[in-house]
Swiss-Prot record:
CDD domains: PseudoU_synth_EcTruA. Formation of pseudouridine at positions 38, 39 and 40 in the anticodon stem and loop of transfer RNAs. Pfam families: PseudoU_synth_1 (PF01416). The active site is at residue 52. It is an enzyme of class 5 (isomerase). It comes from Geobacter sp. (strain M21). The gene is truA. Its EC number is 5.4.99.12. This is tRNA pseudouridine synthase A.
Amino acid sequence: MRNIKLIIEYDGTAYCGWQVQPNGRTVQEALEEALASMLGGKTALHGSGRTDAGVHARGMVACFQTDKGMPLRAFREGLNCLLPADIAVREACEVPLEFHPRFDALAKHYRYTMLLDDLRSPLSRLTAWRLKGKLDVDAMRSACAAFVGEHDFAAFRASNCAAKTTVRRIYSMDLVQEGPFLHLDVKGSGFLKNMVRIITGTLIEVGQGKKSVEDVARLLKGSDRQQNSGMTVPPQGLCLMQVYYPE
């Protein structure tokens, strides 16, 4: 038996998230259908985590096990021939049988992209959230520093989040300006449901002068989503960039 690790890129616009569910088309479902067609039978695919409806990925990691002796290049090219245009396997490699993409992950890097422009951009509408008006980016950067470290992120999760613990560690959080685009890059041990989107919404309110760095610190000391943390920004600006594993 072989354990095949895939690095997957996808445009999440048309999907109800990563994980298979009864109420809509998902990325995992499309990949498992392609695997079944290529390998001649149902094959379970295990991902490094979930992304919500409309969220994208450049570096989702997933694994499947097979006894097929195909070369690795054939797995990648075969799947890409069967997958729709909005999903692609970027890499395929063989890993030890005990490797699990979720449980062995050390950290994840997410990026949220904002378009700071009073005029709408048709070409960016599916990969960035447009904001009108100016933001105090320096104040937002100061607030980013408050999130770094281990904190209880209960105030920065969806109301229906079912995680057993809300403590997470953020390794780095940076804002990168690229022309009219402002990217929030967050690297952490793991993330609660909607956590990055709520953090982004909170930082935007700091940039608009509606919240202060002290407000952010106070929210991190609380344990209730009802504390008036920031809005949950739309999903299209969010992208899973990379998942990190031990060398």
